[in-house]
Each structure stands twice: as C-alpha cells, then as structure tokens.
C-alpha cells in the first residue's frame, strides 16, 4: 500500500511539477539550462559567430511575444579560478561591490540572491536601466567566468517588474552547473 501511494504521489508530482515540453540547452563543460520549450523559442545561432573565440561567449536568447532572456559569458582574467558557490563570504561581497560599481552607469541595484535549481549556484539579480530600457540581470561566476542571464520585456517602455523577476527566477530554477571548466580560446 505504501509503495502504491508513493508511486501515485511521484506520478502526480511529475505531471504537475515538470513542464510537459521541457527542453535542455547545454553549454558543454559549463552548465545545462532546462526550460519550457512550449513557452519560449530558442535562438542559439544569430550571434554565435561573434563569440567563437576570445574572452566572451554568447550562448542564446530564449524569447516569446512578451519577454526575452539573453545568456552570455565573460572570462575574467583578474578573477581566474573564482567560483561564487565556493568563495569565502568576504570575497563574494567584494565581487558584488565590483559588479555594482561596473554597472553604476545603468543605475544598478541588487534585488535578491537566487539559488539556481541545482542548489549550489548563487545568482545575484540586479535591476538595471540602459539606453534600451529597464532590464534584469542575474549573474554568477564559475571558475573565473561571469555568466549573465538578462531578462527584459520586448516592449522597452515596460518596467522590469516583479512578474519579470519571477520569470527570471523560474528560468534560473532550471540551471545546473556542469562542474568542468569551459574551454575558450584567447
């Protein structure tokens, strides 16, 4: 009886919790991101040619009629080896200060820290505004690589509100570190 109840509960959880149209984007050696393929269109080709070599790498945009998520990486020579999930609290705070200083021209403010779906990757979520309008950015660092996930409404007149922030949290819930160092040519 207990086994039957457990299996029924597991089946119900799978039906109601897991997206029916789950897809996975994989940045080999770095991370995987599960997302709802029915809700978002993936474009991982448009800017791929711009990041084949060098210190930066564009991964993709996920978008629908209302909002867009844009993910990229920047290798930080001065922070080689830094991983936020394993860094001492003092180092994490000094990096956060550097990050906020870097984006001061975009009125950066720390909104929250979100633990990714793997339970081991902290992302700082910043509220920002540039010449294109308001947006959110979630950033973490893995082995000296800053990984950014930007979120914005396609209508740039809309504020980066709680609804957009919740959509960003949901996207981060599908993030999982791969645990290996990505290979980027200089």
Summary of predicted features, one role per range:
Residues 15-21:
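C-terminal segment of classical bacterial N-terminal signal peptides
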Residues 1-5:
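Positively charged n-region of N-terminal signal peptides that target proteins for export
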Residues 48-146, 156-157:
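Conserved polar/disulfide-associated segments of primarily extracytoplasmic proteins
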Residues 22-57:
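N-terminal "mature-domain start" segment
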Residues 43, 99-107, 172-179:
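Sec/Tat-exported extracytoplasmic proteins
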Residues 39, 146-186:
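Surface-exposed amphipathic alpha-helical segments
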Residues 8-15:
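Bacterial N-terminal signal peptides
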Residues 30, 86, 90, 158-166:
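Soluble non-cytosolic domains of exported or imported proteins
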């Amino acid at each position: 009886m207990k086994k039957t109840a457990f299996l029924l509960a597991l089946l119900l959880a799978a039906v109601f919790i897991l997206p029916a149209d789950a897809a996975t984007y994989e940045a080999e050696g770095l991370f995987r991101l599960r997302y709802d393929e029915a809700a978002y269109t993936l474009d991982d080709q448009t800017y791929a040619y711009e990041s084949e070599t060098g210190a930066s790498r564009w991964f993709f945009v996920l978008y629908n009629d209302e909002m867009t998520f844009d993910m990229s990486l920047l290798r930080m020579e001065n922070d080689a080896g830094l991983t936020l999930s394993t860094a001492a609290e003092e180092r994490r705070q000094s990096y956060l200060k550097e990050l906020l200083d870097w984006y001061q021209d975009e009125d950066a403010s720390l909104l929250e820290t979100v633990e990714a779906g793997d339970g081991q990757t902290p992302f700082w979520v910043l509220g920002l505004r540039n010449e294109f309008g308001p947006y959110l950015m979630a950033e973490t660092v893995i082995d000296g690589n800053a990984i950014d996930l930007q979120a914005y409404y396609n209508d740039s007149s809309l504020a980066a509100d709680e609804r957009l922030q919740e959509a960003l949290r949901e996207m981060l819930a599908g993030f999982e570190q791969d645990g290996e160092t990505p290979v980027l040519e200089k």
